[in-house]
């Protein structure tokens, strides 16, 4: 009886040890799985961050020229673009800063260079947006029967401006397409001999704000 009892104890002890070993291996496997998952998440996060960096450029690399393609965006992130608008000293009414999100999103939607779009609005409406343009929400002097077309809101006015530029002036086959440069847009948008210099001058003022962003 004693032998059997001891044997039973031995068997039980051996069994308990086996259970403990299995449990230990299970915990180790669980830890390894969690570590693998953490590494995969970290790798995915790193990849996403790399993509964001690749898609956006430093403010130091933003450039403009008179013969630039106006359908090529600046490459700035929205955050940096808003900083640029905040640093735009000519924007005393804060129209450009307050509408920076809308302007940025519309330029993305309609493939328009942000600096050109701001420069054009300023050239046509003034940095502080003249009363007739502010009242009609018409920021690039779109006309009908010799009068500024009236839009219902700032958002609609900006959207129509971007849409018309894209469809009519900056897209091959568009109604008023003459090229993707300032000189090309000028042919039908405003034949005035000083228009290119006016718009580019306003764009240059925006560039001064770009250089202030750290």
Predicted regions span which residues?
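Catalytic cores of secreted/periplasmic lytic hydrolases that degrade extracellular macromolecules
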Residues: 1-115, 122, 127-214
